[in-house]
Amino acid sequence: MTFFLFAKQLVDMLYQYQILDYIMVVLVFLLLIYQTALVRPNFRKRFMLTDGIIILLGLLLTVTFIRSGNGYQIYFKVMSAFLLYFVGRVYYDRIKECYGGLTLAAYFVIYINFFTRLCHFGFAFLKVQNAGGDLYYYDTDMAFAMILAMVFITMFGRNTVFKLVTVFVICPCMVFSSDAGIQMVLMIAVYAIMAIYFMELMSNQQRLAGIFLVMIISGLLGIIAVIYMPALGFDNSEFVISLFQGGFFNNDNMYSRYVDWKAVLDNCREQGLIARLFGSGMGADVIIQSLYIKIFYSLGYVGLGLSLMLIISIMYYVTRVEDRKTFYLAVIMAVLLLGSGVTVNSIESTQMSWFPLLFSGMVVSSVQVEKEKNRRGGRICLRL
């Protein structure tokens, strides 16, 4: 597991070598089989509602894949993300022992890309508006990797001057000197969430921290709602884009997204009832730069409903996890996956989906084990 967590961030950076992704999936299968055979969990006792929702989404996607007859790469990527959820379920305790590997890989990813950009642009790299993705395909992928690495270093790295420089100087320079608009918004949100976490640690004001956290998440949901208004026909795209004034989102890219989104939604409306309920296809030949619209296109209203149930179910367990670091880490992962999904089909990116689903599974198992320990403790007290 330590090797997997260390290698995953580096494999994402080496995206052009697709064979590495397949090797990682094989490794995940082997890890899952090994740990299941070693622990031999009671599946009937351990089965949770969240597990059932994941399985139903996988079955629904399989039916869509069989119906469409194409999109095997999409199917492979999404199913591998679901697989990572179950890896998190069985490795929940082992993952916490491997945070050092996550941190080391995070430093490698940040500074390899930083020196690559420095060699490419020189000391003018701060004026760069489009970095070309550095060692990633797009700036969005690069910025997501920087934020993810920054989170791992902040949460698990040793407190040093080097860590502070990395988190507060290098990472923001890499993200804000790029064309990754949505990731800039998410980076600000992640900084705010981490600030709330440290405020809670110092003041022990969990309720106040919860209020601030709700305010941030509500603000993000409001931004998402405003962005999608033109696609749903509630307002014109010129008005929404003018709100951002090109500060975070590239105007030309947003206009093209609105055109694509409306075309996809119009196509879905023209389909029959079965297609609207269960999806129109895998969308291998359609450009859909949105997680939410892609779910509707591929899985229909049923898939949207199941996805909403999955989010609610996972967040239910997140709010009940006792370890506050795990709680904030899970919240940040959810913000990154769902926030990136506004302008990127993040569930089909193994870089964006694997870690959030892995930690989701870990949280569900952690809460389940904590409940069992509390029950045993209660029984012992009654006997005494």
Predicted features along the sequence, with ranges:
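Charged/polar, solvent-exposed surface patches and flexible loops
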Residues: 242, 263-266, 270, 316-320
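Long extracytoplasmic/lumenal interhelical loops at the membrane interface
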Residues: 247-302, 350
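Flexible juxtamembrane loops connecting transmembrane helices in multi-pass membrane enzymes
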Residues: 208-211, 223-262, 274-275, 282
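Hydrophobic transmembrane helix bundles of membrane-integrated enzymes that assemble
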Residues: 1-238, 287-375, 381
